[in-house]
């Protein structure tokens, strides 16, 4: 990259920041094809999920993209699914059509829209619930791990998590908790 926040932050804080990446001491093992390609957000999410569950888990992070990251009972992160996020889906619907307006992403009162706005909200939200449920069921089947815990996080996760039994819990602070764990594991490591 042509830029870095590290020198500025180091000078400002008088401390060297903890840069999340595959070289940190971690409780999880990055078994992805290319560990350096695993984003910091996904590392901290999986760190927290594995620590909390003490076993296999899928962390669903509803961000710009929605990521479904699997950590097995041995703490190995190897498998992932990445889908367009709810916001991207809604934006595409608006930007790629002639007359559909921008919408607030929220669950409408009914799956049956009574106007363009509620019809779009229904399609985006309920369509996304279906996508999430299908991906989670297929992941569990492919992994032969039907008992893994599914934790949802991310700003729009609350919209989906409450609507499906495939998600065991929603926690908006997964990333912060994962960062804290990594900090504790690495604070004395040089």
Predicted features along the sequence, with ranges:
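Nucleotide/phosphate-binding catalytic cleft detector across ATP-hydrolyzing
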Residues: 1-58, 73-190
């Amino acid at each position: 990259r042509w830029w870095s926040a590290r020198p500025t932050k180091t000078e400002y804080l008088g401390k060297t920041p903890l840069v999340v990446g595959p070289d940190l001491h971690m409780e999880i093992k990055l078994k992805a094809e290319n560990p350096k390609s695993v984003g910091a957000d996904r590392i901290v999410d999986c760190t927290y999920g594995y620590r909390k569950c003490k076993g296999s888990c899928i962390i669903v992070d509803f961000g710009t993209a929605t990521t479904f990251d699997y950590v097995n009972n041995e703490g190995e992160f190897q498998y992932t699914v990445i889908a367009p996020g709810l916001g991207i889906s809604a934006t595409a619907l608006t930007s790629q059509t002639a007359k559909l307006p921008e919408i607030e992403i929220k669950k409408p009162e009914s799956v049956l829209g009574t106007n363009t706005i509620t019809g779009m909200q229904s399609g985006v939200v309920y369509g996304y619930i279906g996508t999430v449920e299908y991906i989670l069921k297929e992941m569990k089947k492919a992994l032969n791990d039907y008992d893994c815990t599914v934790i949802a996080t991310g700003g729009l996760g609350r919209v989906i998590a409450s609507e499906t039994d495939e998600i065991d819990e929603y926690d908006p602070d997964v990333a912060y908790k994962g960062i804290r764990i990594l900090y504790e594991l690495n604070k004395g490591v040089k």
